[in-house]
């Protein structure tokens, strides 16, 4: 977060509608609804209160920043996203960290050639 503020100060961002400010995850308490709202770019999310434990957050790089904005836009349109890239570059961790930031559960499973429809059924039913 400190790096985010340093970047905003360095770029002399003063307007609340500037994209460099809008792309940051912003948390608001909505008094009328008595719950928290998170906004990323122009997409609002209700905080889902999913307890995820106390863990370290991911280090934010320009690439993870773009990933969050892109995935947030997709979620805002009721779509999904599938980050692509070489192994070990943080694709899964970026998705999990975004889910943690908005308080939603993120289930990760690996699709292999042994994954059949019975196992998928168990996964979707929560077994």
Which positions does each model-derived feature cover?
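Conserved alpha-helical scaffold flanking the Walker A/P-loop in AAA+ ATPase domains
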Residues: 115-127
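Extended, charged/polar low-complexity intrinsically disordered regions
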Residues: 1-62, 66
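Detector for methionine-enriched segments
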Residues: 30, 77, 119-120
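Walker A/P-loop
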Residues: 73-110, 123-126
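Flexible beta-alpha connector loops of hexameric P-loop NTPases
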Residues: 57-60, 106-117
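Active-site-proximal segments of catalytic enzyme domains
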Residues: 61, 65-72, 78, 117
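Short charge-dense sequence patches
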Residues: 17-23, 42-47, 70, 75-79, ...
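Active-site-proximal structural scaffolding
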Residues: 64, 88-91, 113, 117
